[in-house]
């Protein structure tokens, strides 16, 4: 009756949310995935072989924040390190933004102000003083 039909069964690895959260942190932080401008919840879900909705649940339940807030915090922290680094003192704010994973300088500006209460330009000025 089923001749000619090919049945495929995909085996999914089952991980609990704590294990997924640990893998997520390693992938995003240690491997600097946040520096990819196109990095998204969907690309992370695909890499982990889970749904984007499950990624969101893991972030809320295990990490305590949203995917986007977590990634933007990593980007902002990285931008801060670059702004304070003598090696990057001649990089433009646009360069710093792109190296940190932001799509442009204004997005970095908004996130930086939200996280640190000062702008990237003010941070750079304070570092030079």
Listing of model-derived features with the role each one plays in the protein:
Residues 1-33, 41-42, 46-52, 66, ...:
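Alpha-helical bundle regulatory/interaction domains
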Residues 55, 107-108, 112:
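Short hydrophobic/aromatic patch on the recognition helix
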Residues 59, 71, 111-112, 124:
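DNA major-groove recognition helix of helix-turn-helix
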Residues 65-71:
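Short, basic-rich loop-to-helix N-cap that marks the start of a DNA-contacting helix
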